[in-house]
Amino acid sequence: MCGIVGFTGRHQAAPILLDGLSKLEYRGYDSAGIAVRDGEKDIEIIKAKGRLKVLLEKTNAGESVPGMCGIGHTRWATHGEPSEVNAHPHVSDNGNVAAVHNGIIENYQELKEKLLRRGYSFYSSTDTEVAVKLVDYYYQKYGGSPVEAVRHAMVRIRGSYALVMMF
């Protein structure tokens, strides 16, 4: 079962996100990842296949990842094999939108085909990446309004899910 954590505040986000993910380890997972934003800089994505220990080592327990806002995820594969590429978070092609997700997007293939026709690229075999790119499409279409982008995307996504986005 997937686990989702998020943090925004006055402290470094990565160690807090990793601590939150460690509290979800009992649920089982095949990969984990975090996305952290440091002010106006691009969102930094760090992922690892396997145990959370691998992600902790890659990030020096989060200490090497600056930023005070982030999201994290432990994944139990439902679409796509367990791999670093399929691990969450996923990010839009331009890096503006990152997301973690739990659940199933039933119409992800249909949405993916529409986005491919609009020039989007896909690197994973997850339904989550489709959701990120769909939100990004509406984010660009509606002049950079996160609320409008999410609202328009949610009307089109069918399934049972939780989705946490970071802009």
Annotated model-derived regions:
Residues 1-167:
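Conserved short alpha-helical segments that host acidic/polar catalytic motifs at enzyme active sites
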